[in-house]
Amino acid sequence: MNETTPLLLRAARGENVERPPVWMMRQAGRYMKVYRDLRDNHPSFRERSENPDLSYEISMQPFKAFQPDGVILFSDILTPLPGMGINFDIVESKGPLINDPIRSLKQVKDLKPLQPEESMSFVGEVLGRLRESVGNKAAVLGFVGAPWTLAAYVVEGKSSKNYAVIKAMAFQEPELLHQLLNHFAESIANYLSYQIQSGAQVVQMFDSWAGQLSPQDYDEFAAPYQQKVVNLVKEKHPDTPMILYISGSAGVIERMGQTGVDIVSLDWTVDMADGLKRLPQAVGVQGNVDPGLLFGTPDAIRSRIVDVVRKAKGRKHILNLGHGILPGTPEENARVFFEAGKNVNELIKVSS
């Protein structure tokens, strides 16, 4: 057992590990009372995610409470946008709002290349502090939004139910959309490299809205740009594991496994055993407990974790939810999730 390298990093690299590492998407956030108390004093989401002291404190809250195997930067997938010349705000309960949606060739051509060390030095500072604080007790995770999902936000101007505006662009002016996606791919790759240089040991790309695409449109508008990000990052950081997450990905799991990422994060609508059959042996999995299960009983949570871990046995696996933890989740149930993940070997013995 290698005590000097965090468990999650060893697992993500495909090394033999004593148990699957466990962390949780959105593990820092509204379900935690300490977060809500801090939010009362700092109501602006952008302040909480862009002030290095606040971002660091929030990132550390779940680590102090539950000691997960991964500590993820508290930030937002839209945080790099101002560095490219796109202003946005995040309104509580409404989500992100883009002040001037991108819908013309001139707007795309006017976008600036992202220079994260200048426009986002706070991210580098937080990642460095996290590495210092957690040492080898946990891996530090960075993350970004994938090009399609960023484009969906900046073209629509806000969250959308049917993505009519960006789909109209995709099917009326595909070249315009491809230029925007290409700009985002290059900028996001640059941003990920900056996160890795600053201390991130594993990185995750969220293509949250790619599940809204048909498989053939995923092949045109999402996958090539996911691949471009992966290729550009791997050129500089070949040993940094990369994870890809898509919400509603059941129709494109095989395609996700062909993007070059090391790990595919499955949502909870796919049975773990089925998901693994659809991925190459070399590609690992993350997930995929239903976040709604954390409103259930402790026994239900433990039982599902045993089921997921059993099905993933023999493959590279990081235990996680199939989506971010939901607001209103009892904090005690988050604790049950983490403790069950850490004690899963004993739970499997008892249940067999």
From Swiss-Prot:
One of its GO terms (biological process) is protoporphyrinogen IX biosynthetic process. One of its GO terms (molecular function) is uroporphyrinogen decarboxylase activity. InterPro entries: UROD/MetE-like_sf, Uroporphyrinogen_deCO2ase_HemE, Uroporphyrinogen_deCOase. It is found in: Cytoplasm. SUPFAM superfamilies: UROD/MetE-like (SSF51726). Substrate binds at R26, Q27, A28, G29, R30, D76, Y153, S208, H323. Pathway: Porphyrin-containing compound metabolism; protoporphyrin-IX biosynthesis; coproporphyrinogen-III from 5-aminolevulinate: step 4/4. Keywords: Cytoplasm, Decarboxylase, Lyase, Porphyrin biosynthesis. Its EC number is 4.1.1.37. Pfam families: URO-D. The keyword ATP-binding does not apply. The record marks D76 as: Transition state stabilizer. GO terms for cellular component: cytoplasm. It catalyses: uroporphyrinogen III + 4 H(+) = coproporphyrinogen III + 4 CO2. Catalyzes the decarboxylation of four acetate groups of uroporphyrinogen-III to yield coproporphyrinogen-III. Belongs to the uroporphyrinogen decarboxylase family. Homodimer. This is Uroporphyrinogen decarboxylase. It comes from Prochlorococcus marinus (strain NATL2A).
